[in-house]
Design a protein with these regions (language model features):
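Acidic, surface-exposed loops and disordered segments
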Residues: 1-147
Length: 147
């Protein structure tokens, strides 16, 4: 998948509104052609060169922690987040595990597409951790596990 927001050339769209809702992000799914434009190649390279480590985007009870001290399902979620694209490709999200409850936030981030970045990261975490439930909107959004 590819999540496109701030790098999108909005003038190329046939329409950017639907039923009164303004389009804010585009998600493309599929395989890229063998030869891709230089701009896309640069974005792809930036994602591959991200150097964040799991400990940089995880906390336990609000304090820094290491993967070895976290449950396996949590680490699977974190690893998926580290591999996923985001709208601005900076991965500014932090996942916390406090008393068995996961929350996600983007401390000190103020950009136009931060809610998209947070949602993309939440989705990848949820899918990889294999938890069933729903995320609260906003920050910090807690994950409510389904019974």
């Amino acid at each position: 998948s590819c999540w496109i927001a701030e790098t999108m050339d909005w003038k190329t769209l046939a329409r950017d509104e639907y039923n009164g809702l303004k389009l804010g992000i585009i998600i493309s799914i599929g395989y890229a052609p063998e030869k891709i434009p230089l701009k896309q190649e640069g974005i792809r390279t930036a994602i591959r060169l991200r150097t964040k480590k799991p400990a940089q985007i995880m906390t336990a009870n609000g304090q820094p922690t290491e993967p070895e001290q976290m449950p396996e399902w949590f680490n699977r979620g974190i690893n998926a987040v580290l591999a996923c694209p985001t709208a601005i490709n900076k991965l500014p999200v932090v996942f916390d595990l406090t008393d068995g409850v996961v929350s996600a936030s983007m401390p000190n981030q103020r950009h136009l597409v931060q809610d998209y970045d947070l949602g993309i990261s939440k989705l990848h975490f949820e899918l990889a951790s294999n938890l069933k439930g729903t995320w609260e909107l906003g920050q910090p959004g807690r994950f409510i596990v389904s019974e």
